[in-house]
Amino acid sequence: MSQNDTLRLAQEFLGRMGSDAEPTEIAKLFSETLEWDIAGDTGALPWIGHKSGRAAITDFVRDSRAMIDRITFEVHDILASDNRAVILGSLASKLKRNGKVVTTDFAIVLTVANGEIVRFQMLEDSFAVSQMARG
């Protein structure tokens, strides 16, 4: 893929997430053999940790929509190469079950091959996320 193709794929992912597209529509951007990694307190929230397969993204979309109210989600920049896009931004979310809010900067690293996302890695303030979830 070219740098522009990778950038467009990252933008399409963000667009689908922001438009409340169905989880299966979002998942079509991802490989069946997706590697999913959000470092942090595994068990605090169902999407934290290492997972494999396209179900990781559908589960994330479904679970996060059910459990979290998005307050803000701001993309500050998208950096792209032929096989990787890095989305830099900040977010604030409220956990529905306890009303706690987390505010954090983030980096989402999307690795792409053959026109689809093969690896999703999110870096955020995992300590703050854990405190919100366990709080």
Where are these regions (language model features)?
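A beta-strand edge to alpha-helix "cap/lid" segment located at domain peripheries
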Residues: 2-5, 62-135
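Short acidic-aromatic low-complexity motifs
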Residues: 2-35
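A general alpha-helical scaffold signature found inside nucleotide-binding enzyme cores
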Residues: 8, 52-56, 105
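Hydrophobic pocket/interface hotspot
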Residues: 13, 26, 34, 53, ...
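Short, flexible active-site loop motifs that bind/organize anionic cofactors or intermediates
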Residues: 16, 47, 119
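Residue-level recognition of oxygen-bearing side chains
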Residues: 22, 56, 125-128
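A solvent-exposed, acidic/Ser-Thr-rich amphipathic alpha-helical stretch
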Residues: 31-77, 82
